[in-house]
A protein has these predicted regions:
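Serine/threonine-rich low-complexity intrinsically disordered regions
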Residues: 17, 35-36, 62, 68, ...
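A periodicity- and composition-biased signal for non-globular, repetitive helical segments
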Residues: 11-12, 88
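Short acidic, gly/pro-rich beta-turn/loop elements at beta-sheet edges
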Residues: 18-20, 67-69, 101-102
């Protein structure tokens, strides 16, 4: 089974903006109700421990349909909210090649 990963790294100009966006992002993900992909996608939202102005959103999806649906939703819902804050963004799309647990 293919596992797709998307890592979004956002760096804001203040911790307050970062905290505000994290809260808004949590609420947007909780409110998103795309039943056709609900079991195919998840997100981990993290605040950087060393830089309080930086956060990550790590999306895991089981197929391209889930990523496509998320892309459409993100473009219409998430990005307009994020773009009201001054920020830098790095986005990495990847396919999981190994998972090691010890």
């Amino acid at each position: 089974m293919t596992v797709l990963k998307r890592l979004n790294i956002n760096k804001f100009t203040s911790e307050a903006d970062n905290d505000a966006f994290i809260e808004e992002l949590k609420q947007m993900w909780l409110a998103w109700n795309e039943t056709s992909i609900a079991t195919k996608i998840s997100v981990d939202i993290n605040k950087d421990r060393n830089d309080p102005t930086r956060m990550t959103a790590f999306v895991t999806a089981s197929d391209d349909d889930a990523i496509s649906a998320m892309n459409k939703w993100s473009k219409n819902v998430v990005m307009p909210v994020r773009d009201k804050y001054q920020h830098e963004n790095i986005m990495i799309d990847a396919e999981l090649v190994a998972s090691v647990s010890k």
